[in-house]
Amino acid sequence: MPKRTDIHKIMVIGSGPIIIGQAAEFDYSGTQACLALRDEGYEVVLVNSNPATIMTDTTIADKVYIEPLTVDSVSRIIRQEYPDAILPTLGGQVGLNMALALAKTGILDELHIELLGTKLASIEQAEDREKFKELCQKLGEPVPPSKTVKTVEDALAFGDEIGYPIIVRPAFTMGGTGGGICHNHDELAEIAKNGLELSPVTECLIEKSIAGYKEIEFEVMRDSSDNAMIVCCMENFDPVGIHTGDSIVFSPSQTLSDKEYQMLRDCSLKLIRALKIEGGCNVQLALDPNSLDYDVIEVNPRVSRSSALASKATGYPIAKMAAKIAIGMTLDEIKNPVTGTTYAEFEPALDYVVCKIPRFPFDKFPKADRVLGTQMKATGEVMAIGRTAEEAMQKAVQSLEIDEKDLYSAKAHKASDDEIEQKLVRPQDDRLFYLAEAFRRGYSLEDVHELTKINFYFLDVVKHMVEMEKEIEANPDDLDVLRLAKKYGFSDQTIAKLWHEYPDQVRDLRKANGIVPVYKMVDTCAAEFESTTPYFYSTYDGENESRKSGKKSVIVIGSGPIRIGQGVEFDYATVHSVKALQKMGYEAIVINSNPETVSTDFSVSDKLYFEPLTLEDVLNVCDLEQPEGVIVQFGGQTSINLAAGLERHGVKILGTTVKDLDRAEDREEFDQIIKSLHLHQPQGLTATTHEGVMKAADQLGYPVLVRPSYVLGGKAMEIVYSKDELEEYLHDHADIAEDHPILVDDYLDGRECDVDAISDGKTVLLPGIMEHIEHAGVHSGDSMAVYPPQTFSDEVEEKITDVTKKLALALNCKGIMNIQFIVRDGDVYVIEVNPRASRTVPFLSKITGIEMAQVATRVIMGESLEQQGYADGLAPEPEMISVKAPVFSFSKLADVDSYLGPEMKSTGEVMGSDHTFAKALYKAFAGAKMQLPENGNVLLTIEDRDKEKILPIAKRFARIGYRIFATKGTANFLKKNDLHVELVTKVHEDEQADDNILNELRDGKIDLVINTMGHDIEKNSDGFIIRQMAIQQNVPLLTALDTADALLKSLENRSFATDALK
């Protein structure tokens, strides 16, 4: 059926900020969908609150609204734009839930707006646990014994009836939010209560656990003519019981017999047809490893995280096809863009193995609960492609950018047998390394299977790699063993370690004997049809399929997996760098390992290499492509860390030189530059021993800021207020050494700001200064920021501009850089300089209209700022005021302290823009899901040193009609100052009392918590327990008084003053 001509304008709802469970995959799918709709001639209106995405670029849709994803806000845009239809199935769970909420308000019926793609009834049937169970039973498809409940009492009664373990699955949530496995009555009571609160329809499915079954996923497409096809079958390494987003996943399935595959395939197609889904959908199934029995787990009636993985694993662009199906086209009339000759109805065939491994945030949160279950905890993922499961898995481990570079973990090596068995039985994010360690200690496949329930085939893959380690170690410099090792994915670094050599020695031996990788094409059809996809992976098997073109080429290094401190913002910069290179006539080549992102869409660059971002893999691509050079400024710390090694091997680093990159990051060299330019910076000392750090802190006087050098996202950075706290910090971060010094800085309390600048060596352009709303001490990634600045004088802005220019020229910056300042008493202090793109690039690019990554790329390639039409100094400021607000995922991570400090904790961001600061703040808070009633109850739990500062804030809350709740000390202080305060008892005072602080939170009496009790790092401290309870109960929480002040500004703007005349 040809595309529809009765609709002209389509609204696409984006997925909002990145949180655990909903990461960059929706930027990728949303971007694809918008471009596909525009290709077909439709006018596209996009609504999304996330400025960090390619999707919210003005080139992606005809109209782009970066506005809060709330019913009010989206309804206002609908009334302004009058779209003919809305496409909600590409914005993750947020997009789906928004469509359902809009339908309930009646606006869609009132304005005759149609929902494209899967119909509302189908979405409800798939998402509503009870309706879905009834459908499966009607179709004769098996589901685990289960019951939908709306109260904790019903959950407990059903638990007693069917026995434990039990899985709780809240309705209409994503990433397993609020769910979990319960082994007893108490666990079920707690998880069911939490799940009911987090479900938008207060409903949970309680089902008998089938943990231990194989978990299989099918990515399925269907059109309105009932053509349906399987894009990809994926098999989880981990059995059922661990959320698929936290599981290692292989594609194609590795252990299914043809009979099992056809049985599960038929079930998936039967489900998508019965649900009448139009577009892409993900079917999750559980297969008994010992029989042909299976159960249907769930269907996601939308494009999902797995769809992004399936698209990259097969080369089949699911979101693009889903968008075309939504406008009435059928699979037999849509061309497959990979082959250009076959149609979209052909099921992809794979002649390689893909392995996905999740990337977890526990390097940032060492005290978090790391046990994996049905609630997702990973922030991102990596994917690798090889000819064998071993090769794909090894390459995926190398892509993770964690301490472990292969299957050997020093921590696992030190563990006792008991500890290893514990780790195998209760899976954590690092279980793979403990599996390998168990095999090194002689555990049999049967022993390990008994402990883990992981399929024997996958265990054999891990065991084979451990056996290969022994063979490599026993045969140093043996060429046959080297060939075999490379075939199974062992890196030069690992082989060098086993041979007690340097990686360069292994590389030289390899190259001298012609043991070099070939690059194979990902073509969706296992080479059955002619294909010209510029999408490659390396292997040591077969012929090379990547041919060097005659054009001059430049390699852009991506930023790897999404993690805290290095998010989708860096992918945004990578993609824009590619665009600039293409406009200048270069062949733009991307190397990256992240399946969720736009940069790994093969249609974005001229050539895509899906490879680990290690020195070895990047050098191998350089050896083949012989580029003009490599750009490292846009891939975050990942690419910067590769610069020195690449240069050492003769690869040209374009833009700022390696020597100058080092001068910015090396503390002593940087101090010299600051001194020579007569600039201010907080006094700081460097120490390489425990005693040295203690002495430095005494010399500077507390509080001090302590951190390791060379870090991203403020990792292991803390403000320390006493000797005891410093001792604890050093105990937690014991790896101080000559080459790992600790920096100790005088902590300056002032206004912090961020500047992104572009320099060509003569001219320095400052697109804008972003003022942080929180005082110094909160990491810039966790601070709210406003542009243009609201409290800086012209004189201060001039000083900031002057210092930026001096530093850019002194550091010989060529390209982009980021500087952070503290402004105190009119003086400007330099905190740090990052000689690369920062996470504020997308935000600032969108509000100033200066495509910073593109401008910087042109500078890197030799085009001056003047030639591009830019003048020296600060760019003119727009009339609109824009606020960037961080978004956190604390509800997904138990035991992570939500107190904000110099270590970054946010996973995403939103933006609010308007003509006044208060309105921009209101939109930013709304986008970050911090919408408060016009009057309500605020709980204040405040450090003694903050008591004076809280007084004006408390008075302002009282003036707009808020009731104030506080514990004894704060309450007495506020009462003395003529404020009416409701007294609550402390956490450990009378735990049964109705007015105990935790019971007040549990009973839903509190609308907002302001808690500044942050410097006790213990998990049983009052401050920590109150914060945890606020997060569990979904109560907005602030830990910085500046944020409370900003929130008040937005609330006051909505309220009317009621002041007596007398």
Curated annotation (Swiss-Prot):
Residues 402-546 are annotated as: Oligomerization domain. Pathway: Amino-acid biosynthesis; L-arginine biosynthesis; carbamoyl phosphate from bicarbonate: step 1/1; Pyrimidine metabolism; UMP biosynthesis via de novo pathway; (S)-dihydroorotate from bicarbonate: step 1/3. This is Carbamoyl phosphate synthase large chain. It catalyses: hydrogencarbonate + L-glutamine + 2 ATP + H2O = carbamoyl phosphate + L-glutamate + 2 ADP + phosphate + 2 H(+). The keyword Coiled coil does not apply. The large subunit is composed of 2 ATP-grasp domains that are involved in binding the 2 ATP molecules needed for carbamoyl phosphate synthesis. The N-terminal ATP-grasp domain (referred to as the carboxyphosphate synthetic component) catalyzes the ATP-dependent phosphorylation of hydrogencarbonate to carboxyphosphate and the subsequent nucleophilic attack by ammonia to form a carbamate intermediate. It comes from Lactobacillus helveticus (strain DPC 4571). Residues 133-327, 671-861 form the ATP-grasp domain. Residues 547-929 are annotated as: Carbamoyl phosphate synthetic domain. The keyword Phosphoprotein does not apply. Mg(2+) 2 binds at residues 298, 300. Mg(2+) 1 binds at residues 284, 298. Mn(2+) 2 binds at residues 298, 300. ATP 1 binds at residues 129, 169, 175-176, 208, 210, 215, 241-243, 284, 298. Mn(2+) 3 binds at residues 820, 832.
